[in-house]
Amino acid sequence: MQILADLLNTIPAIDSTAMSRAQRHIDGLLKPVGSLGKLEVLAIQLAGMPGLNGIPHVGKKAVLVMCADHGVWEEGVAISPKEVTAIQAENMTRGTTGVCVLAEQAGANVHVIDVGIDTAEPIPGLINMRVARGSGNIASAPAMSRRQAEKLLLDVICYTQELAKNGVTLFGVGELGMANTTPAAAIVSTITGRDPEEVVGIGANLPTDKLANKIDVVRRAITLNQPNPQDGVDVLAKVGGFDLVGIAGVMLGAASCGLPVLLDGFLSYAAALAACQMSPAIKPYLIPSHLSAEKGARIALSHLGLEPYLNMEMRLGEGSGAALAMPIIEAACAIYNNMGELAASNIVLPGNTTSDLNS
C-alpha cells in the first residue's frame, strides 16, 4: 500500500542542533554537570523531537490501549478464558483497571480501542477500529492478511495524528488480549533471531508445565508462516495480532508528528521491533518505561538498544507501565524549564561530574 510507504518516508529526523543547545542549557543549571543523570539525558532527547519545538514540555497525555483476541488461544497457551478480553475492555470504560487508575494519577486520558475483540456486537464505550473477531491461529494460518495489517496501521496512525493536532504531546501504548504474549514472542524470536525457548515466558501466570507447549506453538507458527524478519508488516501479519499492529501504528503516528511515545511491557517491545523494521527513524522517539518481567524482555530491549527507566517487576500490560512513567517525563521537562542557572547566581563549578554543590 503506497500510502503507508509514503508516510514511513516522511518521519522527521531528530534535531541534533536542538539537542546540543539543550545540553549546554542543562550544563548551566544550578547543579554539578551530569548530576541529574538520566533525567538530563531524557530532557535532551525530548528537546530533539521536532514536535516539541526544541523545548521539552508535556501538554495533553494519552494512553492508547489496543484490545483484540487471538486465534492462537485455542492452542492452550493461556489459562484465562478468552471472554476476559471483552470483560476487561468493559471494565476499562468504567475506569477500574490498573492502567485506568495509574493514568488518572498521571493526568492522562485512556483511549480503549477495539481492534479485534471476539464479540458479536461492538462493546459500548470503546473506539471501534475492529478488523475482525480475533486474529487467525498463527499455529495453523497467518494472523491476518497484509492488507488488513496495512489498513489498521494507517487507521491508527491517522487517529494518533488527530490526537496530536488536538494537543496531545505524550503518548503511551498498551494492550489487552488473552494469549497475546504468544504472538509477541513469535515476533521477538523472528526479528532477533533468538530461539523461541529463549523468549517465551509465562504471560498471565501460565503454569510452568504448559510452557513447553507454548514454546512449541511459537516455533510451529514461525516455521509454518515464514515471516520475513526484515519486513515489519510481514511479521505482524503472519505471526502477530491486531493489538500488536495497533501498538506499532501508535508508534509510527507519534513519530510522524515528531512526538514521544512511552513503551509499556513485552507486547510493546515486540511491536516496536516490527515498527523499527518499517522505519528505523522512529527509534529516537521511543522511550522505554519499565522492564517487563516476561522472559524475553531483555532480549527484545537489547535488540532495540533501549534501557528502561523503571524495574517494578510488572507484567500486567494494559499500558500500566507507560502511565506509571509519565511523571518521569514531566520531571525531566521541569528541571529543564524551571531550574535556575549557575551564571545568574555567580557560581562557578569545576568541570567535575562528581562535584557536589553542597560540599
From Swiss-Prot:
The keyword Transferase applies. Coiled coil: none annotated. It catalyses: 5,6-dimethylbenzimidazole + nicotinate beta-D-ribonucleotide = alpha-ribazole 5'-phosphate + nicotinate + H(+). Pathway: Nucleoside biosynthesis; alpha-ribazole biosynthesis; alpha-ribazole from 5,6-dimethylbenzimidazole: step 1/2. InterPro entries: Nict_dMeBzImd_PRibTrfase, Nict_dMeBzImd_PRibTrfase_bact, Nict_dMeBzImd_PRibTrfase_N, Nict_dMeBzImd_PRibTrfase_sf. One of its GO terms (molecular function) is nicotinate-nucleotide-dimethylbenzimidazole phosphoribosyltransferase activity. Keywords: Cobalamin biosynthesis, Glycosyltransferase, Transferase. It is an enzyme of class 2 (transferase). Its EC number is 2.4.2.21. GO terms for biological process: cobalamin biosynthetic process. The active site is at E318. HAMAP family: CobT. Catalyzes the synthesis of alpha-ribazole-5'-phosphate from nicotinate mononucleotide (NAMN) and 5,6-dimethylbenzimidazole (DMB). Belongs to the CobT family. Homodimer. This is Nicotinate-nucleotide--dimethylbenzimidazole phosphoribosyltransferase. It comes from Escherichia coli (strain K12).
